[in-house]
Structures are given as structure tokens and as C-alpha cells.
Amino acid sequence: MNALARENGTYAMVAMDQRESLRKMFRDRGFDDSHERMRMFKTAVARELAPHASGFLIEPEFLEHVQPFVPRGLIMAVDLLEQERGGIVEDTRLDEVERVPEGVVALKLLVIWRDDDRRRERIEMCERFVALAERHGVLSVLEPVVREDQQILAAARELGATRPSLYKCQAPRQGDVVARCREITEVVPVPWVVLSQGVPPEEFPLAVEHACKGGASGFLAGRALWTNTLDAEDPTELLRTQSVPRLNELIEIVDRYA
């Protein structure tokens, strides 16, 4: 796990593999959603944030553009998203890549967990994903996402059992959050980190604190770090003056509580 962890064994990672959801953010702000704008933004985030992080997540389409700016912990998404323009991710499939680019140290798979008749199918996909990463000699980062807050633990119990290298989990939002995070720690047999989807950026530091108090080992966050820069034609200055301090604040929280 040293390929993604910091010296003290914790994780402070940046997610930049958003696809249609990021395009929609650009459109909502009056910008075009072209490949060039996506490339520009993702490259800027990598250039400014990756040097401060222990890992950086990107999809294959933009990997070669960000790789020069990622000094360590390069994670490649291998999820194929079923997502209509402007909509949410409805489902995912595993892209069983035949080769992993040099420099990539981990693969990541997003899974939409539901309590339906396809649960066994999703478990098998996660098992294939873990085996795929092992076959390529890299780590596996599994990211199950649920629609209802109360489903987080069920998904963790079911899919954490496939034993990825690292489990990426939503932050519980209701009830005794620290106690709920302890329950996640009890059922997931591998280290886990919290993601920022669904959490307002200003509330994410507290979510990280609660998660780490409950046994999480850090975070893999995207929107909580860079959403505030989307209104700028060139996000560089805001990334430097707002996103980097925000990332460092989260790292301090992890160091204190993880």
C-alpha cells in the first residue's frame, strides 16, 4: 500500500475522474463542455494539487495529460459509466484493460450498489476487478456508491468482502456518524477512505474528522477540493489560494484523527 499511502500510513488523495458530471458543471456555469476544457481543468488540478497529495485519480482519456504533474500515486479509473447527458451514473461496467500504462500504481472501480436481484452480479464484477489489478501488479481501489444513506453499511459489508486493496466509502450523513463509521471499519477487512460526493465542501472537513475517528485512514476527494474554482476561466489562481489550503487542512485532520 506504500504506493498510495503517506509515510504515516494514511491517505490524502485527489479525485479528478469525473466525466459527464463535470461537463454538466461547466455547462451550468455557461462554459463549453469540450474535450479541451476538460483537459485544461484536469491538468490544472493535477499540476496544483497532486504534489501535495499521496494519490491522484484520473480516467484513461486524460491520463497522459495529467501524468507529468503527478509525482506519485497515479490511479486509473477502469469503470465504464452508464450515464445520460446531464444525468447521474445509473450503472457501471468493468473495463477489463489488457495493459496498464507505466506509472499507474492502482486501478479504481465505481459500483452502484442496490438491494436488488443483481447483487451477486455486482459482487462477481468486484471480484474480477480485484483479480484484474492483481494480475497487472497494481493496487485496487473499490468505490461502491449507494442512493440511500442507510445502505452504506450493507454495501460495505457485501462488497468490502471482495478484499480490494483500499475501500472508498461515502460519508454517513445521519445519526451518530462516528459510531456508523466504526461499523464500517468492523465490516470492511481492508483500509478505507472517505469520499466527498454528496457532502457540501464546507462540511467535508467535519466528515473527514468523523470518518477518521471511526476508523477511516484518510480521504479520496474531488468536488470538496476544486468545485469552488469552476467559475473561473482559468482555475489556477483559485486552486493555489483556496484548494491547496483546503487540501492541507484535510491532511491535518487526517494526521490528527486517523
Regions found by a protein language model. Name each.
Residues 1-116, 202-205, 209-218, 223, ...:
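Alpha/beta catalytic barrel-like cores
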Residues 55-60, 106-121, 154-177, 194-196:
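Catalytic beta/alpha-barrel core
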Residues 68-82, 122-142, 153, 178-199, ...:
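Alpha-helix-loop-beta-strand connector modules within alpha/beta enzyme cores
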Residues 113, 146-147, 173, 225:
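Conserved beta-strand edge residues that scaffold enzyme active sites
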Residues 133, 159, 211:
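Hydrophobic pocket-lining residues that define ligand/cofactor binding sites across diverse proteins
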Residues 139-148, 170-172:
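Short, surface-exposed recognition loops or helix-turn segments adjacent to catalytic cores
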Residues 172-223:
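Glycine/small-residue-rich hydrophobic helix-like segments
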